[in-house]
């Protein structure tokens, strides 16, 4: 197959002409999109890659490949459900046609009820409880995806992360300029928390239960008063909070507004030695 530079050029050109692409399109375009998705599925490429300066670079052409696949793939029966049940979809399971040898080679644990769509990469030593990992996502080694947690399209989950029960990590395919949601290495995301809209949780951070972070969420460091938007600094301990409401026109006190509060910041050694409960205890 073509090298990555040529593959990118083919997909970029096809995306510019996407209105003419449908389920009857074959040849170079179909082969290129399928190849790109297979590379994502194997972890040989990823939608977002961290650079040496700590910033994340988005490979938009890979997002475009995922979007083109929806135009190219027809709706069809997807097998593999419990007791022989099926689905009606355009995206096959990652585990379609897998045999025992494939699971052994991949070296992660997937318990009954875990759903992973093709083009999502799951690294060795990951544990997938009954959960959902969407296409284009990347889950790095040693991470736990707990029961009913969801990892959205193209989301990036780092090494040794714990996504607790019911956690939602938002996906993003459109608009194209939007960046995927990123959870960096060694983070703990508490039960029923949500991180969406391309926000970044930096390395070693702890989110308590029920923390919601989107692009409009104010993240306030109660020690310094500093306000962050869209990003939690490294080794932060974050809990839900609220901001005082502004007065209403009649002079009464207005409703409080939700925010996330950084209650403390810890260094790497403290984070490694201290239990999550102790970190969250104020």
From Swiss-Prot:
Substrate binds at residues 109, 146. InterPro entries: DapD_Trfase_Hexpep_rpt_fam, Hexapep, Hexapep_transf_CS, THP_succinylTrfase_dom1, THP_succinylTrfase_N_sf, Trimer_LpxA-like_sf. It comes from the Bacteria. It is found in: Cytoplasm. It is an enzyme of class 2 (transferase). One of its GO terms (molecular function) is 2,3,4,5-tetrahydropyridine-2,6-dicarboxylate N-succinyltransferase activity. Pfam families: Hexapep_2 (PF14602), THDPS_N_2 (PF14805). Its EC number is 2.3.1.117. Pathway: Amino-acid biosynthesis; L-lysine biosynthesis via DAP pathway; LL-2,6-diaminopimelate from (S)-tetrahydrodipicolinate (succinylase route): step 1/3. The keyword Amino-acid biosynthesis applies. Homotrimer. Belongs to the transferase hexapeptide repeat family. This is 2,3,4,5-tetrahydropyridine-2,6-dicarboxylate N-succinyltransferase. It comes from Bartonella henselae (strain ATCC 49882 / DSM 28221 / CCUG 30454 / Houston 1) (Rochalimaea henselae).
């Amino acid at each position: 197959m073509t090298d990555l530079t040529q593959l990118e050029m083919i997909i970029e050109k096809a995306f510019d002409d996407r209105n003419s692409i449908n389920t009857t399109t074959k040849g170079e375009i179909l082969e290129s999109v399928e190849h790109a998705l297979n590379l994502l599925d194997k972890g040989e490429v990823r939608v977002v890659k961290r650079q040496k300066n700590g910033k994340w670079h988005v490979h938009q052409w890979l997002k475009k490949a995922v979007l083109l696949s929806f135009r190219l793939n027809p709706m069809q029966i997807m097998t593999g459900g419990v007791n022989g049940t099926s689905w009606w979809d355009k995206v096959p399971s990652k585990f379609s046609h897998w045999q025992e040898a494939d699971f052994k080679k991949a070296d992660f644990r997937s318990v009954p009820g875990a759903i992973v769509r093709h083009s999502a990469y799951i690294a060795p030593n990951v544990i997938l409880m009954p959960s959902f990992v969407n296409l284009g996502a990347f889950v790095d080694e040693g991470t736990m995806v707990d029961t009913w947690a969801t990892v959205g399209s193209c989301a990036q989950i780092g090494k040794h992360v714990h996504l607790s029960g019911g956690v939602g990590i938002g996906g993003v395919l459109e608009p194209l300029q939007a960046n995927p949601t990123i959870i960096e290495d060694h983070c703990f995301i508490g039960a029923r928390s949500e991180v969406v809209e391309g926000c970044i949780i930096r390395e070693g951070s702890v989110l308590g239960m029920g923390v919601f972070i989107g692009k409009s969420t104010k993240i306030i460091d109660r020690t310094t008063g500093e306000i962050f938007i869209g990003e939690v600094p490294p080794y932060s301990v974050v809990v839900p909070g609220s901001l005082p409401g502004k007065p209403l026109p009649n002079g009464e006190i207005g409703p409080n507004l939700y925010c996330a509060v950084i209650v403390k910041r810890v260094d790497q050694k403290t984070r490694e030695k201290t239990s999550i409960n102790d970190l969250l205890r104020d």
